[in-house]
Amino acid sequence: RGLLRGLIIRHSSSTGETLVGMVTNKGRFPRGFLSDLTQDKNLKRLGIVGLIQNINSQNTNVIMGSENKVLWGKNRYIESLGGLTFHLSLGSFFQVHSKQAEKLYNLISQWTEEAKGQTLIDAYSGSGGIALWLAKQGRNVIGIEKFEPAMEDARQSANSNGLSNCQFITGTVEEHAA
């Protein structure tokens, strides 16, 4: 049983930013490993903006644990899509194929055209991609997601895009259905 369990690389083709996550068991990296790995010039040349250790000591098929340590740089990378800026952390959900995401978001925007003036629910919101897209179109949206780091990403993205017509609630859809 070694230290490294997996590697997660999240990259934005629109901004060139890359966030790297090393999923590990509990333990320490070999002496000198982190100092060699985190030399600014090498990471910046590759577009890496953050290097994160995610600790998962559970003997399951769950990929990520709940504890993150920033080893170098930032804990989020930036994705740009359709004039919006998204702040994304290692474990929060965002569509992987940005061109298809834009098509999907535009389709959802068309479907919700008749709901202008009503409040829409983005259930299982992830990092808020759909909610933010609809808010940019003038819709009032509430995003609901169980994973708190994703909600933090969504709130930061809403704030940086100047969107006040969306809010993000942590919890399950069932907890907030009324």
Question: What are the roles of these predicted feature ranges?
Answer:
Residues 2-6, 72:
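Short amphipathic beta-strand starts and helix->beta connectors
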Residues 6-10, 78:
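Short, surface-exposed charged micro-motifs
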Residues 8, 19-21, 93:
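Short aromatic/hydrophobic contact patches that present stacked aromatics
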Residues 11, 22-24, 88-90:
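Flexible glycine-/small-residue-rich
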Residues 16-18, 117-118:
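Nucleotide donor/acceptor-binding cores
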Residues 17-28:
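C-terminal lobe
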Residues 29-178:
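Rossmann-like S-adenosyl-L-methionine
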